[in-house]
Amino acid sequence: MSQKQKNTKLLVPIYLEALAVTKPMTASNSGRTWADLSPNFSSFRRRNVPKLGIQFAPVPFQKGATPPDMGVHLHWALPAELTHGVQHLGEAMQFPTVPNRWFVLRIPTDAPDDRARAKAWVLESDYLGRDGTNTFLTYDPKSETFSYLRLGKAFAYGDGPKENQNYLQQLTAIGLGNPLFAAFYPGCRNVFGFHDDLAGIDAGTFSYLVAGWYAQDEDDPLNPADKWQRLKELKSKWNVVDLADDEYPTETLCHGTVHSLQWARNT
């Protein structure tokens, strides 16, 4: 069989949703109590504390939980095929690697002044560092010790990442083993979610485009050793249309959009 040339992409639609927070949200002005359900790994610094899941679960609706900041909050759902684990007899459950690079584009469709310009960002979802976003545990098998860094980082398109950065070896939908990791926006910001603060913009209508891919070719599900068998499986599960039997895309590109989101500060 002949194959398509390299870099042929399979476009995979994803569900993208947006929340516009137009004024500061507090318990006093909104009448709501905000729950912070993000895992808290600070107890790892204390000795003689059981390393159990309940130790890391926050107290629901505790006072002082931080409400979402002003701006537009984007959160996207991964393709279902990438959120299901597989467990073989006698082995641990394995989850597939998910896209670890995301491009976010803000597009003004109706803006009153020049400040509401298009802007783009790149997310390194697998970035690990002290200046990352979400608390994330790491384990050193040599010293048999745990420590925590922060996962996920965003930078303006064109700035580029810094050199010699540290990255997670494998990014999956469950993170450290939390089945709600990818589904819970406060715990996966700059991983599978993004906050646009719309600084300096008072009003306008905007659309957002999000696109995700794999930084390493070998992590892409379209680039396995038995690629033709894998394509057959994907065509049955992902409903690939208009693809001939002798065609084979070599890269996955996830994409989603939100159209005509209205923004008016302090309203």
Where on the chain are the PLM-derived regions?
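Pro/Thr/Ser/Gly-rich low-complexity, intrinsically disordered linker/stalk tracts
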Residues: M1-V98, D219-T267
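Short, compositionally biased serine/threonine- and acidic-rich segments at solvent-exposed termini, linkers
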Residues: S2-Q3, P13-Y15, A20-K23, D36-S38, ...
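Extracellular structured ligand-interaction cores
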Residues: G71, P99-R101, R189-G193, T205-S207
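Beta-strand-dominated extracellular/periplasmic modules and repeats
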Residues: E81, V98, P161-Q169, R189, ...
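Extracellular low-complexity, O-glycosylation-prone stalks/linkers
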Residues: H88-R115
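Beta-strand-rich modules
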Residues: N100-V104, A199-D217
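Low-complexity, serine/threonine/proline-enriched polar segments
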Residues: I107-F181, N266-T267
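Signal that preferentially marks extracellular ectodomain short beta-strand elements
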Residues: F155, G177-G204
